């Protein structure tokens, strides 16, 4: 059965095309620096938003039909698979990401739920063949009432045990589907008030859960990356995985820093009052850059809007960081994004993905041009040149101490003249110059 019979394979037509069902900047098979664009960008479909998100929000019911022609949950789960792979094929998307309950809902017991999940993952494995791949999987340990106080950080040991069992199965499903990543996102791992919270115990327990996951994952042959996806709030008032720097502190405290990388989401950076590039830079500088949830938020709003990314400045600086990090290895660009509630037709799925894919393709082209242009890199290198010789080199080499630095400062006198302009406006103009000359 074809779900989108009125939509053909989306073709690259170039920037002058006015056909909304065409790529203007994403040319999947174009070879750049020895790799095709699809290999550089590694786009992924998000199973939750794309296959299940029907536009329901806190103020109204769904506006789009995501039943895929099936009323029975088991039949619907398989129909989702067929529809997802049709979307991916028509958009030249090679990867998908999932929560366990996106693939198959809960049934009467954990065993029944696991049995039904096995049926669906068997079907996915059969249908994906060598054409489609799992970028990463995760467990949906946040929506059911049992997780109202958290999963790994729950005050109930029974809930912790249930969470571990669910994660165990999600890891098995990820391995079965050939996934190269497994994500922890702590939607309920945090608190509403410290009046009823044992923060130390909760963080200790979260670390215990993650250590168990790493040990079990490796024992069943998972060779990919474990990720944590930082987010400061929503649905919890204060989440423990607030931002990349906070997560790094957590990982280092519990000896998990060699086991985990970051899955950075643009909208989560906005909620933490950081730029997207800031979060990527912190991850890159600390050797924990892994994967990206590609979306954008609204800076005028205080919640996770999960819009499809269309801001070219953001995608350019994102891809600048990705390229500087050496590109993706096991990670990729997962569109953790949903069409707006008022964009409710089947065609809107394709319009949305085309917008996001073109935005990142253009950002990738611009980032490459920025690096090849070299003016920004040269400016930064020149700005810090004093650290290459003389007293700067001595400090870096560990040859200086307070006594020698005091002696140097006394002999040198006032040092204000050693400073140069930061030239922020000039550098921003260079970015514009590169962007609008593509």
UniProtKB/Swiss-Prot annotation:
GO terms for biological process: D-xylose metabolic process. Its cofactor is Mg(2+). Coiled coil: none annotated. Gene3D superfamilies: Divalent-metal-dependent TIM barrel enzymes. InterPro entries: Xyl_isomerase-like_sf, Xylose_isom_bac, Xylose_isomerase. Mg(2+) 1 binds at residues 229, 265, 293, 336. It is found in: Cytoplasm. One of its GO terms (molecular function) is xylose isomerase activity. GO terms for cellular component: cytoplasm. Mg(2+) 2 binds at residues 265, 268, 304, 306. It catalyses: alpha-D-xylose = alpha-D-xylulofuranose. HAMAP family: Xylose_isom_A (MF_00455). Belongs to the xylose isomerase family. This is Xylose isomerase. It comes from Ruminococcus flavefaciens. The gene is xylA.
């Amino acid at each position: 059965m074809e779900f989108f019979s009125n939509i053909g394979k989306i073709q690259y037509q170039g920037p002058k095309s006015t056909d909304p069902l065409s790529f203007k900047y994403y040319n999947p098979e174009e070879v750049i620096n020895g790799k095709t664009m699809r290999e550089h960008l590694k786009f992924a479909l998000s199973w939750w938003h794309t296959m299940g998100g029907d536009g329901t929000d806190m103020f109204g019911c769904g506006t789009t039909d995501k039943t895929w022609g099936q009323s029975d949950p088991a039949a619907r789960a398989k129909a989702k698979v067929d529809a997802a792979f049709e979307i991916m094929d028509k958009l030249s998307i090679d990867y998908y990401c999932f929560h366990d309950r996106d693939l198959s809902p809960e049934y009467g017991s954990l065993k029944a739920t696991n049995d039904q999940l096995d049926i669906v993952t068997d079907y996915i494995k059969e249908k994906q063949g060598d054409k489609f791949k799992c970028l990463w999987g995760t467990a949906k340990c946040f929506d059911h009432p049992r997780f109202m106080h958290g999963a790994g950080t729950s005050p109930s040991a029974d809930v912790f045990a249930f969470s571990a069992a669910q994660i165990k199965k999600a890891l098995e499903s990820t391995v079965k589907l050939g996934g190269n990543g497994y994500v922890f996102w702590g939607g309920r791992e945090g608190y509403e008030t410290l009046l009823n919270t044992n923060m130390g115990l909760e963080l200790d327990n979260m670390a215990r859960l993650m250590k168990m996951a790493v040990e079990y994952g490796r024992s069943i042959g998972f060779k990919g990356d474990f990720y944590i996806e930082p987010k400061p709030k929503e649905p919890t008032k204060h989440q423990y995985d607030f931002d990349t720097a906070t997560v790094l502190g957590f990982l280092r405290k519990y000896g998990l820093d060699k086991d985990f990388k970051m899955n950075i989401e643009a909208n989560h950076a906005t909620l933490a009052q950081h730029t997207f590039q800031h979060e990527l830079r912190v991850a890159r500088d600390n050797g924990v850059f892994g994967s990206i949830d590609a979306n954008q938020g609204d800076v005028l709003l205080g919640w996770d809007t999960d819009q499809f990314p269309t801001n070219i400045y953001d995608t350019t600086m994102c891809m600048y960081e990705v390229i500087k990090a050496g590109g993706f290895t096991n990670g990729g660009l997962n569109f953790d994004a949903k069409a707006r509630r008022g964009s409710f037709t089947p065609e809107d799925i394709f319009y949305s993905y085309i917008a996001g894919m073109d935005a990142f393709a253009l950002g990738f082209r611009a980032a490459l041009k920025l690096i090849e242009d070299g003016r920004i890199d040269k400016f930064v290198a020149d700005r810090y040149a004093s650290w290459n010789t003389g007293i700067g080199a001595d400090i870096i080499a560990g040859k200086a101490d307070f006594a020698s630095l005091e002696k140097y400062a006394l002999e040198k006198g006032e040092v204000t003249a050693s400073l140069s302009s930061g030239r922020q406006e000039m550098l921003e103009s260079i970015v514009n110059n590169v962007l609008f000359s593509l």
